[in-house]
């Protein structure tokens, strides 16, 4: 049975991860850590104040859903301590991923870092890769709850990168230039992501995590959309990563390879 620690355990995602781990018959919730929530209860455990509790609990795997700055500090601790890591925090840059790859290349521990653990969202990206070479234009709209700090989301950036890579691999030319010649309001056309894919962010109460990818071609459009209505939608992917990370040397980015797609 794998002993699992959860960092960021007092947040909404962290508490959901604790519940999922506690309910899994092959996993044991060994420790919950979250300094701002220290002393609170989650799944019958008292939330610990500091990362040192991870070693004391002899956790095999840690799931980190804290904030990006904390993850940057925590990853070297996991790598040096030989604790396998599953990270779902957004806001990590390509440079952060490169640093993590170096850390875990020289570690006895492995890591999985994913922008989105919802299996439907991963499938959306795969469907977008299939569509990208056959359509003339594309834009991405991501919609999240009003407490999300980063914009655009990691999932939307990853989607744009996947679309750009699929077009390049197929030998398709670049996306058409933005036809806008008069910007009445600054930012109205969103941000330019990888491969020139336009990214638009929406933040509203009542939302969880949603993404809509709109492809356009002469006389037609194709819309691919995924909606997470509940944080439980992420748990199958999180648990898959927890169970798989011990057998995935070094750093794995995304859960696509864990799903075999």
Task: Walk through the language-model features, giving the residues of each.
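Rossmann-fold NAD(P) dinucleotide-binding segment
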Residues: 55-61, 65, 69-88
């Amino acid at each position: 049975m794998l002993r699992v620690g959860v960092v960021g355990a007092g947040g909404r995602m962290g508490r959901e991860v604790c519940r999922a781990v506690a309910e899994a018959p092959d996993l044991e919730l060994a420790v919950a850590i979250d300094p701002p929530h220290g002393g609170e209860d989650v799944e019958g455990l008292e939330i610990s104040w500091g990362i040192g509790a991870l070693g004391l609990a002899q956790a095999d795997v840690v799931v980190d859903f804290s904030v990006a700055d904390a993850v940057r500090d925590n990853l070297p601790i996991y790598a040096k301590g030989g604790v396998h890591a599953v990270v779902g925090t957004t806001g990590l840059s390509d440079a952060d991923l490169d640093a993590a790859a170096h850390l875990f290349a020289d570690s006895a521990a492995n890591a999985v870092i994913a922008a989105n653990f919802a299996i439907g969202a991963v499938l959306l990206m795969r469907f977008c890769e299939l569509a990208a070479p056959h359509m003339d234009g594309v834009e991405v709209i991501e919609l999240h709850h009003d407490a999300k700090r980063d914009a655009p989301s990691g999932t939307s950036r990853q989607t744009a990168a996947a679309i750009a890579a699929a077009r390049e691999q197929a030998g398709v030319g670049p996306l058409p230039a933005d036809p806008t010649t008069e910007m009445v309001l600054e930012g109205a056309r969103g941000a330019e992501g990888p491969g020139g894919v336009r990214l638009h962010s929406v933040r509203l109460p009542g939302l969880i995590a949603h993404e809509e990818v709109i492809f356009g071609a002469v006389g037609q459009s194709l819309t691919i959309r995924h909606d997470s209505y509940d944080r439980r939608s992420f748990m199958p992917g999180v648990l898959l990563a927890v169970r798989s990370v011990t057998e995935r040397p070094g750093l794995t980015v995304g859960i696509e390879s864990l799903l075999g797609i």
